[in-house]
Every structure is written in structure tokens, then in C-alpha cells.
Amino acid sequence: QIRDIMEANPEKIRNSQSSIVRDLIERAVRVKAEVVSEDLRESGRREILNYGHTLGHAIERAERYQWRHGAAVAVGMVYAAELALAAGYLDETIVDRTRAILKSLNLPVGYRGDRWKELLETMRRDKKARGSLLRFIVLEELGKPRVYEVPDDSILYMTYQEIAE
């Protein structure tokens, strides 16, 4: 599994020329191609590929696209994990594991606390939003994504405090 390889080899993954990085990219592309081929119109399963992207895209915009996409999505992944924990979908050990893996790869796991209102406004314009409900891809367990329509902005804000710096 991709996550296990990342967890076991952070020093090799930090070297973009390593064979492990090539292997991970090939694995990720195969997974993405499989998901896309099952849902060409992004009306169902393909939505899982947006894991970490709702907040990640808002961070990219807030930073005027000066952040790398992967760094912004990494923060979004931690936020999605924290949302899943708050909703009772995910165990705290998986949230901690997610943070640890991303940190070991020198990726950010938090973002500025003073940008919340701007991020929320941007997320409301996200293609995945449905009316006043923001939709996030979260995990119920490793390898088992689901859509979470967050019922209340207070949940979003309280969860953001878990990643705010």
C-alpha cells in the first residue's frame, strides 16, 4: 500500500530521483486511472480523488499560488483527517499517523490561524459545495474514503483550530 511505503521510507522519498519515488508515482497513477475510468463524469467515486483538496485549494488561493500544490493538499489532508475524527468516522491514531507521515516528508501539517474567514469563503465557492453545505472527502479508515457534508460551520471552525498555527 502506498501509505505503508511512504511511512517506511521517508528519507528515500525526500530524494525525488529515488526508485521508490518512481514506484510511488506509478502506483498513484494506476489508482487514479482506475478511479477515473469508473467515473468519467466525476459524479460518484471519482470524487475521492479530491481528498485534501477542498482546503488545499483555498490555501493555494490565499497564498496567491506561491505554495506548492502538494504542500497545500498535505495541510488539507490533515484537516480532512481531523474532520473525520470530529465526526466520529476516524480513530485518532490514524490522524496522528497522517500527521507523522507528512511531517517525515517535510510537508506542512498546519496553516495560519488568522486566515480562517478567507479560507471559508473560498471553500464555499468550491465545486464540491452543495448549497450551504461544504463537502469533504474524509476517511472512515485507511483506504476507505467517503463524502462528509459538514452540517455546521462551527464544526469546520473548531476543526480548523486543530491545524491553526
Regions found by a protein language model. Give the residues of each.
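An active-site-proximal "capping" alpha-helix that borders the catalytic cofactor pocket
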Residues: 70-85, 97
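Residue-level signal for inorganic ion chemistry
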Residues: 53, 77, 142
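Short glycine/threonine-rich catalytic loop with a Thr-x-Gly-x-Asp
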Residues: 45-51, 67-73
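Active-site His/Glu-centered metal-binding helix of metallohydrolases
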Residues: 51, 55-59
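C-terminal charged capping/lid subdomain of soluble metabolic enzymes
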Residues: 2, 89-165
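Catalytic Zn2+-binding segment of zinc metalloproteases
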Residues: 58-67
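Carboxylate- and glycine-rich phosphate/diphosphate-binding segment that chelates Mg2+/Mn2+
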Residues: 1-49
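Short alpha-helical scaffolding segments that buttress acidic/His motifs in well-ordered protein cores
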Residues: 24-32, 77, 102, 123
